Amino acid sequence: MASPEPRRGGDGAAQAARKTRVEANSPLPKNSGSLNEAEALNPEVTLSSEGSLNLEDILYLEDTGDLDETLYVQETEKAEEALYIEEAMQPDEALHVEEPGNPEETVCVEETTEPDRIQFVEGPVEPGKPTSPEHVVYEGETVTRAEKSNPEESLRAEQSPSMEENLSIEDLELLEGRFQQCVQAVAQLEEERDQLIHELVLLREPALQEVQQVHQDILAAYKLHAQAELERDGLREEIRLVKQKLFKVTKECVAYQYQLECRQQDVAQFADFREVLTTRATQLSEELAQLRDAYQKQKEQLRQQLEAPPSQRDGHFLQESRRLSAQFENLMAESRQDLEEEYEPQFLRLLERKEAGTKALQRTQAEIQEMKEALRPLQAEARQLRLQNRNLEDQIALVRQKRDEEVQQYREQLEEMEERQRQLRNGVQLQQQKNKEMEQLRLSLAEELSTYKAMLLPKSLEQADAPTSQAGGMETQSQGAV
């Protein structure tokens, strides 16, 4: 905001009058231009008098600097004309004192030695004291002026009320022009405020759209995550069922393998027992062959004996050989029958067990082959399920990574928006503080204007009474001269 320039003339006088009236004739360390520092136009007066901005409308403003720049109004071209009142008096003129008739009224002392300053001192006048020597206190300095009893100065004292009246009227006109400019500035600020609110709405819409888009992306990611988790749970259930089935098949396979091993052990035992029986049969066959050889030899001997000439001894020997041959045949038949009775059931049982073991082995091998054939698709399915599970885990990891990135981005955007909100709040607080200052300035200006008007009203009345008294004095002088 541009620094205001000090005002001259009537502003300093009005301020001095107001200060002396409030502080009961105490010296003030302020110059006549101190009021002008609060006089500069601030757009926050418009906001405080017309209405405050809505906080929800400015929460999403990008930069508070633009708001401050648009709310400031430059000084008008005729600021010096509105703030300065030039005096038309000569610097050689002395201090003029106006004494009202009532001793309790204030005395207005106007010093015209300096063209840039008008000093007003208000204070009660004691009826017994003369007012010719007067002490003026302003900014810690005491000014003593003695009124001269010169007829020229008395004429100047008579002419000063009319000049003060002219200056006061011009000051009022300038103040009215200043207030008109303030009203125009207020209207312009209202238009700028509406434009800024419209820009705020336009700036807030993309941010809201981005936030909604981020929310939709997060919801879609959560949906994909939930769907992937459901698929993962379904695949885990299928894998569990396949594992149970595979465990059952493996258990049955182990049981069949145990039975096969038992049958193989039985077959091995049967083979050993068969070898024993075969060895026994071989021994018996050898014994039988030996017996047959012995029998053939005896038979040949007996035949030779029979072919020999018969004799008594030969007959006896022939009978004996026949008896021995019959015994031998009976013995062979009995031994063969005993062997058949002893080993044939065992051999038949062994053959039956061998056939049953062979059939069981073939059946077990067929079942094992079938189980292997059935296990191959299960293994392929298990491999496929493991591959799908790995792919799903990779997809879940990617979805989680994407979700984390989106959440991080959303958090960063949220932090940026919170930072903007804090900046906007600080800007709003500063703006409210400026509004309060401008409201105080407006109130002080209104109070000063009312004080100035109250000062001008008795002066105008005194100036209206002064011509009549002056005319009466001239008549008395003319009569005295006659």
Swiss-Prot record:
InterPro entries named in the record: IF_rod_dom, Syncoilin
Sequence segments annotated as region (Coil 2): 350-458
BP GO annotations: intermediate filament-based process
GO cellular component, one term: perinuclear region of cytoplasm
Regulation: induction: Up-regulated at the sarcolemma in individuals with various forms of neuromuscular disease.
UniProt-annotated stretches for the region Disordered: 1-42, 144-165, 460-482
Modification type Phosphoserine: residues: S26, S34, S325
Chain spans, region Linker 2: 310-349
Database matches in Pfam families: Filament (PF00038)
Region called Tail, residue ranges: 459-482
Comp. bias regions, Basic and acidic residues: 1-10, 144-156
UniProt main location, coarse: cytoplasm
Residue ranges, annotated region (Head): 1-161
The IF rod domain, residue ranges: 168-463
Renumbered residue ranges of the record's region Linker 1: 205-231
Subunit structure: May link the dystrophin-associated glycoprotein complex (DAPC) to intracellular desmin (DES) filaments. Interacts with DES and DTNA.
Function, in words: Atypical type III intermediate filament (IF) protein that may play a supportive role in the efficient coupling of mechanical stress between the myofibril and fiber exterior. May facilitate lateral force transmission during skeletal muscle contraction. Does not form homofilaments nor heterofilaments with other IF proteins.
Name of the protein in question: Syncoilin
